[in-house]
Amino acid sequence: MSGLGDSSSDPANPDSHKRKGSPCDTLASSTEKRRREQENKYLEELAELLSANISDIDSLSVKPDKCKILKKTVDQIQLMKRMEQEKSTTDDEVQKSDISSSSQGVIEKESLGPLLLEALDGFFFVVNCEGRIVFVSENVTSYLGYNQEELMNTSVYSILHVGDHAEFVKNLLPKSLVNGVPWPQEATRRNSHTFNCRMLIHPPDEPGTENQEACQRYEVMQCFTVSQPKSIQEDGEDFQSCLICIARRLPRPPAIMGVESFMTKQDTTGKIISIDTSSLRAAGRTGWEEFMRKCIYAFFQPQGREPSYARQLFQEVMTRGTASSPSYRFILNDGTMLSAHTKCKLCYPQSPDMQPFIMGIHIIDREHSGLSPQDDTNSGMSIPRVNPPVNPSISPAHGVARSSSLPPSNSNMVSTRVNRQQSSDLHSSSHSNSSNSQGSFGCSPGNQIVAGVALNQGQASSQSTNPPLNLNNSPMEGTGISLAQFMSPRRQVSSGLATRPRMPNNSFPPNIPTLNSPVSMTSTACNNSNRSYSNIPVTSLQSMNEGPNNSVGFSAGSPVLRQMSSQNSPSRLNIQPAKAESKDNKETASILNEMIQSDNSSNDGKPLDSGLLHNNDRLSDGDNKYSQTSHKLVQLLTTTAEQQLRHADIDTSCKEVLSCTGTSSSASANSSSGSCPSSHSSLTERHKILHRLLQEGSPSDITTLSVEPDKKDSASTSVSVTGQVPGNSGIKLELDASKKKESKDHQLLRYLLDKDEKDLRSTPNLSLDDVKVKVEKKEQMDPCNTNPTPMTKPPPEEIKLESQSQFTADLDQFDQLLPTLEKAAQLPGLCETERMDGAVTSVTIKSEILPATLQSTTARPTSRLNRLPELELEAIDNQFGQPGTGDQIPWANNTVTAVNQNKPEDQCISSQLDELLCPPTTVEGRNDEKALLEQLVSFLSGKDETELAELDRALGIDKLVQGGGLDVLSERFPPQQATPPLMMEERPNLYSQPYSSPSPTANLSGPFQGMVRQKPSLGTMPVQVTPPRGAFSPGMGMQPRQTLNRPPAAPNQLRLQLQQRLQGQQQLIHQNRQAILNQFAANAPVGINMRSGMQQQITPQPPLNAQMLAQRQRELYSQQHRRRQLIQQQRAMLMRQQSFGNNLPPSSGLPVPMGNPRLPQGAPQQFPYPPNYGTNPGTPPASTSPFSQLAENPEATLGNRNSMVNRGMTGNMGGQFGTGINPQMQQNVFQYPGSGMVPQGEANFAPSLSPGSSMVPMPIPPPQSSLLQQTPPASGYQSPDMKAWQQGAMGNNNVFSQAVQNQPTPAQPGVYNNMSITVSMAGGNTNVQNMNPMMGQMQMSSLQMPGMNTVCPEQINDPALRHTGLYCNQLSSTDLLKTEADGTQVQQVQVFADVQCTVNLVGGDPYLNQPGPLGTQKPTAGPQTPQAQQKSLLQQLLTE
């Protein structure tokens, strides 16, 4: 503490002022302030006295806390008192002499300095605030080589390295200058610091370049500095504040020997990709190539019975991400023994395109070569390391060492290192472990990891980990002591890395390698480049057996672990009879890795073979969804899968064989598994295990079950077991997952299992109840059951309604459970056929037959819902001889919505089943297929027209026909029979491709793309579709089952004729359209699209018969005539529009978005003749020409803007309008909704169009695209025929999907799209929805579709808009269109022409009604004039 006289209150003491430093002290008038300042000063002095590390305080930019200083002072005083007391008690009186060490120092001041300096091992110097050395001790010479005189009064910076000047200044100058924060009492503070700086060594005297270099040598000195802020007066000299420094040499770190190491890069299969030897070369040792090779060889060399460290590390790394091995030895050619250890890390490149890889660093331990591997501290991440703490107290000696849980490597290591005394026990345990790890090592680190993981978690992993391996035998397991417990706490031991004693003891014989097999099974997974590791199977097994313990956090480990677990199905883990299958395991592992990769890729959407289980994708995506599946089933499935993998020559691509159906490990949420092709064994064989499961309820059987497959023949049986029909496996999963053992479920399952494939082919239909039960189960099942059997045919209607109602609830669950369905759908190998819906007894159909990758997954739950109808559809398709051809439903994924998908899916499935199924690979499969087809054919052939029609309705085929789905199918399948359905299918094809416009169909893939197929509208279309139609949601147009070919049974002549006529009409229409479009090409970009589409459509047209030719000629004539009329009408329209002040929507606008839904008038003509043909009063017969209709009604609505619009549109459609109509109008007219290009030029006419007017031109600037929606006023038109069609919804439902309504651009949906879809024959179902968009988009509809029905005047609410009443009934659909708003109709006419063709085929009314303006969309079935009669042909056949 400062002396009494030192107080700042003493004015006579000059020191006091200096100490205060603050001018405030002298000026302070308040004693209080003075007291505070004095208090602060003392506190700071206290701090200096108390702490040698005041530098800690200095480094702060804030003053030290007073309380802390006082507290420390108190503590220090107390400590001193205690020390004094202790001293007094221990002092020996004898030593109280003058020279005693305990007496006061008698060393004189002069001799103390040198002694202190000598003791300091450094030199002492003082630097003033200007940086000059005021004093330096003589011993500086021994440190820096300078004499004392040389340095005195020189700048300290001359001997400091430039880089250390700042640090020195920081200590020299006041804190206020350094930190920028004023410290009021700074002048009174003494600061101590320690820092390192480089001091220049005195260069040699001899000059020379070398000396110049030498002069730059610096010595790193550690400086301890104390700042003396107070000036010191000594001998009359006034020493200002200065820095007192003591510099000493830094203790030199021990010379670091160059580390000899090299790095390897391995892929996820463990293969070395590259070796980096740069550090070895840098070490400069000779012969590094040799010991690099020897080291790698030793690293990959098996350790006795245990796998090599490379394998062990690989497993551990894949599981945990990092691993390190114990030391392993190798001998160089010269006899030198070296040891090395390896550390590995799993690296994930940033680029998703790059595969993860393992970086390993191999460090040569020359000094430690003598150490045993156990002693190697570098062992790294060995599992034991992690676990040892678990029970370090237990010494290995306890003999507990046996824990099987010890990773083999660990246990070995542990055993060797822990106590060889336990050798046998330890070994056995270690062995079991090793077998674990080895086995796993052989395959996947997973096993090892599993064991290790358990250890890591500190669980008695031995039990949890190994039990699946049947390690229970080891006493360790009984004890439940985890390996970690008996293992030495040393970390170095890595699980599975430790050298394993080769003495197998314990229950496991030396061959314990058998354990390897399970591991190997696991290992098979382990190779997966996917990062799925076989070891996971172990985990999964554990989890299965042990439940929570098993998880052991495996999944937590790494994505790899998770995948591994999924991959390693418990079955893999199942311990198989002790077989040394290390090679097999390795191969399996590699195969499995590839398989897993393929599985993963399949998830990515790569097609998997039908063999692959859809489960894989689902499981992987569903992650935990299947974790619930019963352990028993999972193990059962996995076991078989494992065996399949092991025994079957598995294609690396993981083709059919690899599908491990059941391998969903409950532990790992994502179990991606492949399904083994069922072809390997008969159904009954495959079902044996399932039967057993049903009979035996206890999970305890799993092990035996899993072991049995091993006993079975290698590939075929085991594969077959695993390969149980994917559907079946799915069923099993489902059953176990739901764990419902309802008698009914069992009955269904047993029924399916008891039936052989052949039997199943002929199995009676399941009742809907059964189906329902199954479906419910299915909630947790894979979507795909291999139940494509079309045999089950619940009454069509029942199926329709019930399937929808029954399955809709399930669909949501399916969607949730089967998120991977879509992906699976992409996988051809997924059991699409199964998706037929396990509900059907047809499950028996071979998976090979029904690989139907089809969109079963795509179909999703709906596919299941659809399954029943699908079966029928399938049968129908077969009849047409296209049974297997089923196109893959391009739209299946997108379009198929729950209910709607049901039917379309069915079609697709049926057609795709064959395609995807690929011809059955086995004779049995082919025979089955033939039998199925024959049955279908015979069944259908036995039906009369009425029954077939009912079937069609039940299946929604009629709707499909209307939607044009069948046409697409026919395209894909050469029409083998002249069945009308094929013909109809042909027709939609024509349109489908051409209209790739923005119409929803654009989303469709495959033949449906062109189709308006409102698929996109599926979810979006507001249209409410009646449940039956619902099957084809607004997207239905595309959805129509492709396979819905009508029963081939003797096709009605009527149907054939209708088809032919329709096709003929379509061809003519296409030709006419093309011609017109050519004219319009310049005007409307849409026109161009249409044209190309039309051309495409035309090409596919089937050969024409005489009837068709005649029809075509008639149509050509009528079209030409119409064109002339249209031109005239257009001119008239232009005149009228001008006269009306543009009141009429520009003809091109036709945008009158069929705003009044053009209620299809009477039935659309069923005959090739355009509905308007000869019906238009005063107009030439409506030719099929797309525009003809527009021209026909011009007068009718001349007064009405609508009629005007129609004419204008019609006239201008092809450049015809060009003369009178604004180019914009023309463009609008020609723009096809698909193009979505609606010139906004229409705005001119906009004034005439009131939002309410049905005529509102869709082309009107996009803002008016809503016009279509406005059009709904047409709802007034809705005739009862519209039925379920709601006008508002109808607008959306229009075949054109009313892109216009929804989309600012009326034309967005392809005009023709609607045509293909609009054709829905069934009473203007959802197809109408599709048509609406067309209407709005019809702007191009100037190409009138003869098939388009104009709204009947009656239907039109607005009298002005109404054409003469006769048009409704009299006019063909084309005329009807005209009758609507001329402009609108004109746009629609072209679309409708196509539609009408379709309509003619299907039955004009519904279609025409659909074509009606969106708003009105109700098909105006009401006026059934000749058209109604005409439409009756197809409708009679197709609809009631």
UniProtKB/Swiss-Prot annotation:
Comp. bias regions, Low complexity: 422-444, 661-682, 1415-1440
Top-level taxon of origin: Eukaryota
Motif (LXXLL motif 3): 633-637
Compositional bias ranges of the Basic and acidic residues kind: 83-96, 615-624
Complex and partners: Interacts with PPARA; the interaction is direct. Interacts with PPARG; the interaction is direct. Interacts with ESRRG; the interaction is direct. Interacts with STAT5A (via FDL motif). Interacts with STAT5B (via FDL motif). Interacts with STAT6 (via LXXLL motif). Interacts (via LXXLL 1, 2 and 3 motifs) with RORC (via AF-2 motif). Interacts with ASXL1. Interacts with the methyltransferase CARM1. Interacts with COPS5. Interacts with the histone acetyltransferase CREBBP. Interacts with DDX5. Interacts with the histone acetyltransferase EP300. Interacts with ESR1. Interacts with GCCR.
One GO location term (cellular component): nucleus
Name the UniProt record assigns to this protein: Nuclear receptor coactivator 1
Subcellular location: Nucleus
Region of interest called Interaction with STAT3, as start-end residue ranges on this chain: 361-567
Residue span of motif LXXLL motif 2: 112-116
Major place of residence: nucleus
The bHLH domain, residue ranges: 23-80
The record's note on its domains: The C-terminal (1107-1447) part mediates the histone acetyltransferase (HAT) activity. Contains 7 Leu-Xaa-Xaa-Leu-Leu (LXXLL) motifs. LXXLL motifs 3, 4 and 5 are essential for the association with nuclear receptors.
Cross-linked sites for Glycyl lysine isopeptide (Lys-Gly) (interchain with G-Cter in SUMO): K732, K774
Designated gene of the protein: NCOA1
Span of the annotated motif LXXLL motif 1: 46-50
